[in-house]
């Protein structure tokens, strides 16, 4: 009993230290959260498995540490996605890997539900993304449409929109048909 207690405390402490390090990152810094989430996910896999192997997946100790880890990985993904620049067209896919892993390791119902909710939001965003090879053109077209919507209703603005988007649409057609 005492030996298993000591054996489990070390990986739990390792996980808690990694969680604290990820929490200390500026929540508004997208790239810092991407890095922190990746490091947190990769650096704790072995320790989490050790805890599960020692005390079992149904143990309260394991459930608490797994849920805390899932919540922080989830938060890194949320912070990254919410603060990623518009130029980062892959942000939904990158954040989704965090949400998927957090959902996989979460145990408690509240944590699982929160992970599932965020996973579903990103899944919808990923499903609605243009193919990667035309993401830049798609973004430029959206920007042209945004500018157009702010203009008064005049034929000249419509012509400008058409002239600015025609080469982009032709490029998209050439790339994906």
How would you label these PLM feature ranges?
Residues 52-53, 100-104:
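Amphipathic alpha-helical segments of tetratricopeptide repeats
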């Amino acid at each position: 009993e005492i030996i298993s207690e000591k054996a489990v405390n070390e990986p739990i402490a390792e996980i808690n230290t990694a969680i604290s390090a990820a929490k200390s990152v500026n929540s508004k810094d997208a790239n810092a959260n991407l890095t922190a989430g990746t490091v947190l996910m990769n650096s704790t896999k072995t320790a989490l498995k050790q805890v599960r192997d020692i005390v079992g997946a149904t143990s309260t100790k394991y459930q608490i540490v797994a849920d805390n880890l899932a919540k922080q990985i989830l938060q890194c993904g949320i912070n990254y996605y919410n603060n990623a620049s518009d130029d980062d067209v892959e942000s939904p896919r990158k954040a989704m890997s965090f949400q998927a892993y957090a959902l996989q390791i979460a145990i408690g119902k509240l944590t699982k539900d929160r992970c599932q909710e965020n996973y579903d939001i990103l899944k919808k965003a990923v499903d609605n993304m243009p193919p990667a090879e035309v993401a830049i053109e798609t973004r430029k077209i959206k920007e042209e449409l945004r500018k157009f919507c702010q203009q008064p209703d005049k034929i000249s603005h419509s012509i400008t929109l058409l002239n600015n988007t025609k080469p982009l649409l032709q490029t998209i057609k050439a790339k994906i048909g």
